[in-house]
């Protein structure tokens, strides 16, 4: 019996010995293959291990934002010579030729940065939820140049912001906005829902000024209303002295406001380094026929003889996107700390 116990002890010691040897070799191979993963900097190489679980968790805090603005349009007859300075509520009631209505929509991405005391707050870009209060349309002269006389004036009547997936239809309010830096915080209070808990972005804020040429990042967004994650490389780090940078992600409309994540010393060390601001674009005017009712298509063999309209078309320049750095985001939140506090939000608990 004693001999049998002694055999098992020797066997166990041998197993432990080989485990230590192989773990040591594994560590040496790891350090040899990824020598810079412990340098305290943001990684520039593709992650050495899977990150699907972490990215899925992060994605739970990323939401689609939809915004719609409703306008009332007053149309004037040619020759009435109405100028902007003439416009008053009383003038519109007396001199308008006819009234019509239309709406403008936009969509983008927001990230949940706060969920406490039945309140929720999301960070996004200001342009996602911003529409002009008034839109002017001017008559043209015989040379096609715009005159000072108004053809119509469209006044924004109301605006609604929705976050897909939130309770009660997902309507939220604008809590704070900075149009210059293109930042906004949206939120809502759910007094009837006790112990409400939304998935807040689960990783720490980073330092965008520490990003370098070639730093690897992940980005989240909602192009074409689909949640997507993509990868990108940083260029022009800290190009304005405030931490702003460019990425080469192929992003589409709907990515605005989407988070950009750096990785410091390997998975799962994600850090929030910014949000996507804009995609460069150029616009041009193209001629289009009048739209038929029911979206019926015109015949390609019958010559068109109807009215032609000049429509402005946008041409997106894919493969380059501007990013608002976390440094600017923190300045924005601190500047609105008192306002947010009055609304019941504690920015020290954001993120």
Residues covered by each model-derived region:
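Active-site substrate-binding loop(s) of clan PA
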Residues: 45-54, 61, 111, 140, ...
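Short beta->alpha transition motifs characteristic of CBS
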Residues: 125-130, 221, 273-282
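N-terminal targeting leaders that route proteins to membranes or the secretory/organellar pathways
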Residues: 1-78, 347-351
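C-terminal cap/linker of serine protease catalytic domains
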Residues: 29-43, 143-146, 153-160, 272-351
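Catalytic nucleophile loop of clan PA
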Residues: 111, 250-276, 286-290
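Terminal peptide-recognition signature
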Residues: 65, 110, 120, 124, ...
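A conserved glycine-rich beta-strand in the N-terminal activation segment of trypsin-fold
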Residues: 46-52, 94-125
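Catalytic-histidine neighborhood of serine endopeptidases
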Residues: 113-178
